[in-house]
Amino acid sequence: MKLLKDSGAALLALFFVLVYLLPVNSRLLWQPDETRYAEISREMLQRGDWVVPYFMDIRYFEKPVAGYWFNNISQWIFGDSNFAVRFGSIFSTALSAVLVYWLATLLWRNRSTSVLATLIYLSFLLVFGIGTYAVLDPMISLWLTAAMVSFYLTLKAENWQQKVGAYALLGVACGMGFMTKGFLALAVPVIAVLPIVIQQKRIKDLVVFGPIAIVCAVLLSLPWALAIAQREPDFWNYFFWVEHIQRFAEASAQHKSPIWYYLPILCIGVLPWLGLLPGALFKGWRERATKPELFFLLSWVVMPLLFFSVAKGKLPTYILPCMAPLSLLMAAYATDCANNIRMRALKINGVINLLFGVACALVIVVIGLGLVKDIVAYGPQENQKVWLGVLAFAGWGVTGFITLRNNARNWRWAAACPLLFILLVGYLIPQQVVDSKQPQNFIKNNFSELSSSRYVLTDSVGVAAGLAWELKRSDILMFSEKGELTYGLAYPDSQDNYISNDDFPTWLAQARKEGDVSLVVQLAKNEALPAHLPPADKVNLMNRLALLWYQKTP
């Protein structure tokens, strides 16, 4: 504890650099998410249009613009590197960690606990996984964490001026959240604070001062909302009904999953601190009367989790906003256990990390060496990746064992359990996954043919985004499949961006008169090239991605 108190800031900075900064540029971008957000921001910068999102010259109305602005600024500062693509997420995660530290200080006035809460937050597997991944969830998580801190300030305000200021901050946080991911940023804070205002009898304050937050959120988002409504009148109709109602409530929602979906996600996501999860949640409920700040945190964990569980559409990234209050609850629980020498939960946490590391190392050995005939992850030339994977998880298990020694005296070292895995994960991915889910590798190996082609087509939106990003051209055409671009392709000025299977032979004959044509197709596992495609002058096949290159005809 003394080390955390004396050198906490330095340790956090070192951990952040090792985990969130050093490895990210060397990891290839994943499709469809990372390639999509990389390309949208590249096109925004190229167009100089920060109001209407376009994706490969096609209107893209799935999200508002504030998250793209983060990514735009990152690419403007750092260029077109993988680091630049991911820096918006990393920066948002860093700001969320600062807010965790600040709220912990407001709650307990104890520097060691504040450092511990921040360390727990940054070492959560879910926070690391999403916080170094180019999606918009770290941005919305930042604004919801800011909303949580702002609402706590409303509870501690001592006069009406402080309450007005705190509710104004709450409105700004919700407004920015709304401009990042829509109405979700308004629903989650309302759901989270209801049990708190009921328990603390603050309903009158919410009714009197709550409109200030609403006004601030509206004033902040209104200029962009009016601007996009003027330029694209159908944006709000599509964004509200399709992206919200259908995704969250209707039977046809995307990513449908059962109501218990988030339970295993939560358990995996809070590693390497899973052993503290039951006790932290129980402590927040058991001591709700004597320590209302714990119930405050519990409400911000449980209520959003229930909301996302009830929704029809589910993705692991949705529960990222629950991690900040959960890290604070865990820090309070762990500190209480250590101070009162109740080490059972801390020892259980060490055992979990030990067993998890050993189990994962064994699984990699068994699968990597081909001992399970039906599961082929690594090829014969990838033994180095297998042993790196074993090393990464062995390090996890060994660190878990270290936390158990001397009556779990070194329990805080659990934060270091995933360190080797985090540093090595980019080098552990099987080549068959790289070739199908990380198209940069494929594109670079075929760059000569692709860059010289007058037309480039593909049947995968994620691969199309990767092609556009690497080739620095937004005129990639969709072939056969429309995917998430279906709505945008319906506009009359975008219909030429799609070539159907039936139209392809005729279109190709005409296109080859203008220059070379490259068609990139994504195949199912062990699938052969479609027989109906016209014979190509050159075919390059890499696992599940294939390039069919058609040379210009006279």
Swiss-Prot record:
InterPro entries: ArnT_tfrase, Glyco_trans_39/83, LipidA_mod_glycosyltrf_83. Keywords: Cell inner membrane, Cell membrane, Glycosyltransferase, Lipid A biosynthesis, Lipid biosynthesis, Lipid metabolism, Lipopolysaccharide biosynthesis, Membrane, Transferase, Transmembrane, Transmembrane helix. It is an enzyme of class 2 (transferase). GO terms for cellular component: plasma membrane. It is found in: Cell inner membrane. GO terms for molecular function: 4-amino-4-deoxy-L-arabinose transferase activity; mannosyltransferase activity. Pathway: Lipopolysaccharide metabolism; 4-amino-4-deoxy-beta-L-arabinose-lipid A biosynthesis. It is a multi-pass membrane protein. It holds the Pfam family PMT. Its EC number is 2.4.2.43. GO terms for biological process: lipid A biosynthetic process; lipopolysaccharide biosynthetic process; protein O-linked glycosylation; response to iron(III) ion. It catalyses: 4-amino-4-deoxy-alpha-L-arabinopyranosyl di-trans,octa-cis-undecaprenyl phosphate + lipid IVA = lipid IIA + di-trans,octa-cis-undecaprenyl phosphate. Induction: Activated by low magnesium concentrations, via the two-component regulatory system PhoP/PhoQ. Coiled coil: none annotated. The chain crosses the membrane at residues 87-107, 115-135, 178-198, 206-226, 262-282, 293-313, 315-335, 351-371, 384-404, 414-434. Catalyzes the transfer of the L-Ara4N moiety of the glycolipid undecaprenyl phosphate-alpha-L-Ara4N to lipid A. The modified arabinose is attached to lipid A and is required for resistance to polymyxin and cationic antimicrobial peptides. Belongs to the glycosyltransferase 83 family. This is Undecaprenyl phosphate-alpha-4-amino-4-deoxy-L-arabinose arabinosyl transferase. It comes from Yersinia pseudotuberculosis serotype I (strain IP32953).
